[in-house]
Amino acid sequence: MRLRPLAALSVAAVSALLLAGCAGSGDTTATPEATATVAADLCSSAAPTGAASEGITVSGEVGSSPTVEITTPIDSTDLTLERTITVEGTGDALVAGDFVNYAITVVSGTTGEVLDQAGYEAGDLLPEQISPENGGQLFGCATVGSRLTIAGATSDETTPIVVYVIDVLGVTPTAAWGEPQAPVDGMPTVTLADDGTPSITIDTSATPPTETEVATLKKGDGYTVASGDTVLIQYRGARWSTGELFDGGDTWDGGSPYSAATTGFVAGFQKALAGQTGGSQGLVVITPADG
């Protein structure tokens, strides 16, 4: 696990940003120049539209489970992947690197049977980080609020054609968007850069707590995390004894948000995550017993 170095510490202070617990919410912005470049890169990877994807009728509100009708029989001959933007969203264009919140319905392209769906309720899905290589064929050139209809051939003889209806619900920021909370006396101090990167200041002369302590720095409005949920987080950790960051205790320095089940973390980190909401930022001081 990325957090195993905590086990070697006497006492550690960790600033953890919960971006999403199973699912997330919120908006993000980027500079126009950067957005134009990465959006163009993502657009170039988008699957083309075609007769198969255009011959599918999808009804219902974006963000709600759709009704899908295969109005024109789909010919799997030479079919690879086609995508039609069924509903054009009015939100920002997706760019490479975005963590996209989405809902998806999977339908048999031959029978019209719904095979699976998720994302229409909070906590169904984690955001997906997209790039030209990962998800670009599906999400390229789409905007928030769009509904995408995708048709593709499979190697499964029982379901040779699969249809996906994807609703683009939003983009999860990589920094907390929650409401600031009052600081807790005796805990380390956390200051934030403009991009949300935290700096941890510890009074190393003070006596550390004898039990793991948790404080909420920002309270988000997202899904409430339960034990065993998979979460998407940013974190930074420092040694109480020196105030210095420790190896392996950082996703901010050249890294990216990290996802795992809460039960995969050390006990102190599990205590910090349970009950938090998406968009929150917490501070936890972990004792050796919980590290």
Predicted regions and their residues:
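Cross-family detector of peptidyl-prolyl cis-trans isomerase
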Residues: R2-G291
